[in-house]
Design a protein with these regions (language model features):
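Short beta-strand elements
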Residues: 127-172
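Sec-dependent bacterial lipoprotein signal peptides
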Residues: 1-20
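Short, solvent-exposed, Trp/other aromatic-anchored flexible loops in extracytoplasmic proteins
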Residues: 83-142
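Detector for glycine-centered tight turns/loop "hinges" at secondary-structure junctions
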Residues: 27-28, 32, 65-67, 82-86, ...
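Short, solvent-exposed mixed-charge patches
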Residues: 20-21, 173-175
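Short, ordered beta-strand-loop transition motifs
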Residues: 30-33, 45-51, 92-96
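Bacterial Sec signal peptide processing site at the extreme N-terminus
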Residues: 17-35
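Short, surface-exposed binding/anchoring microloops in extracellular/periplasmic proteins
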Residues: 40-77
Length: 175
């Protein structure tokens, strides 16, 4: 009986002691657009120094499960980073419901800091046209803690540690 208790206590300690921190980086506009979800995706989302891969624009009504098609009315967007302007061509040749603007594939390498995107006009499937203002993007970080052993056993152990601007996270964790 004593051996079983020791094994149980030891198992509980091992299962609870194994935790892993994971970080995911992305860019979001400072200004929220009421009807659209806009995000900058990093090429390797768990690496702080990975370049911006793409900017996606999605209709927030998609959250109910039904997809709503968006159309970018411009054939390019403009990015401004550190005073330099970049023109990124856009084509919806794949006929996606959402808008994907490929930044890195078009030779623009944004790794750190913020930037401004001039996306222009977006047409909803209702016919409404939204003229997006210049959007100021900043890099954000999502830090989570989870137990891989318990997650394997279908126990959701993920805890959100931080979700916000990378500058705020770095200030918070400075010793």
């Amino acid at each position: 009986v004593a051996k079983k208790i020791i094994v149980i206590i030891f198992s509980v300690l091992i299962f609870n002691a194994c935790s892993v921190y994971s970080s995911y980086y992305s860019y979001y506009p400072v200004e929220e657009i009421k009807t659209l979800a806009i995000k900058g995706t990093i090429k390797n989302g768990d690496s702080k120094n990975s370049p911006l891969s793409s900017i996606s624009v999605e209709d927030k009504r998609n959250l109910n499960g039904k997809k709503h098609k968006l159309t970018l009315l411009n054939n390019s967007i403009k990015l401004v980073k550190d005073g330099k302007e970049y023109i990124i061509p856009y084509s919806n040749s794949n006929n996606y419901e959402d808008i994907y603007i490929y930044i890195y594939k078009n030779g623009v390498n944004i790794i750190n800091g913020d930037f401004i995107a001039y996306i222009g006009k977006v047409k909803l499937d209702t016919g409404e046209i939204i003229n997006l203002p210049p959007l100021h993007f900043k890099k954000e970080i999502l830090v989570e803690n989870y137990n891989p052993i318990l997650d394997t056993l279908n126990q959701n152990t993920t805890k959100k540690i931080f979700d916000g601007l990378i500058e705020d996270y770095e200030k918070r964790n400075k010793y």
